[in-house]
Amino acid sequence: MKNNSILLVTIAFLAGIISGCGAKISAPSKGMSSEEYESLIRLDPQNTMMANFSAVKGMDGYFLIDNQGESTISVVDYNKGETIKKIKLSDPPGTSFKPAGNHHIFVIPGGRYAWSSQRYEKDVMWTIDLTTHEVVDTFRLSMGGKTIKAPLHIGFAYKSPLAVTGNILDKKNGYLTFLRTDTRRPSHIVELSCAGARDAMFTFDDSKVFTTCQQEPKGVSIVDVKQKKEIKWFSIEGGRAGGMTPDGKYFMVGASKAVVLIDTATNEIAKTIKVPGGGGNFTCLPDGSKCYAGLRKDNSVGVIDMASLELIKVIKTGKNGNRLYLNPANTRYGIFTNESGKSETVSVIDTQADVKIIDLETGLKPHNVAFNPEGTRAIISTPKEPVATLVDTSAADPSKWEVITTDIDSGIENNGVRWVPSPYAIKSAMNRFDSKDNQFIQIAASE
């Protein structure tokens, strides 16, 4: 039950300002200055850096699960351990696409709205109002004679109201669609030399976008944002997943038996690191000292020392090792997903000792993980079943983390998961933020 008390998170907000991470909850609007845009809170940790979960500690919230196979998004109350609502999605009138395909939730800077991206061979995306948990816009990305297929992952710019997504299922064309976060609609498309763009990310000054391409010829394309054109591309054998280091110095590529580091200043390959397996996703420690690469065929995670740019350890985990997700309240520990369709485990990793502590049993094919800001709960999607897994991660000793249930009501092909503030918390925060110059943000708390 909510109470009406107000939690002053002045320290967290000031920390956000000092670190360059925004803490203001609001929607991007036309005419915003760069300073105003940078003041918006970032709550999406996937293809964008600088997520600021410390600013929302103590805030009431929910987990959202994108149910790719049934056109719904589950709203999960992790305190009750149950789904309290399913948001219904539909395609635009007059279309005849295969239903659903809603793959992943991406929280737009400001925490007021979110997008649901697309995994099927179509160009439809949805805008979710996080104050009502309803779809407020359904739109298509194709334009100017260019057909977009499967805009899977979304990266957000840092200083300007832009976002970018690819087209992973197009085997002939490579396209990046740029969207505006102030209108929440697509802006323009840039053509690439490699097909099936996947993980697109902005440099921290918003001048360039680096993206991997999943189809042949696999590789990396670099786009000049202002000129709206590709300026370079590399062919990289087995190139698939992409990620940015916390300092923005390198764009990392998960390739065939290699991790390729591209210098974002020079646009040149800085280092190719040999690894067993390869092709998985990346997570780096917040201080940038180490990065962790999923090594799919090796059933492991590789530890890369970013000072020496060398592989320093391989930790055996489970079948089809994909990605490490760090607990935001204590980034020493994280959950690593073993994504095989026959896998029913995730591995808890100690990033200080670089060892596996325990395995936790989940549903089939654990794919994506999200923690609440306090680090006491984690949701794990399991696409091979119509349910998700909820984990108690409150123990200081991660060997005591426990599965609460593997039966959170979701849907078949449940994939992307995110933590979002509750509607009550968002409205309270927006109402009590006095002005852009006010360094005190009052956030609604609940017990």
Which role fits each region the language model picked out?
Residues 1-8:
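Bacterial N-terminal signal peptides that target proteins for export
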Residues 9-17:
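Bacterial N-terminal signal peptides
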Residues 20-447:
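Predominantly soluble domains enriched in secretory-pathway, periplasmic, or organellar proteins
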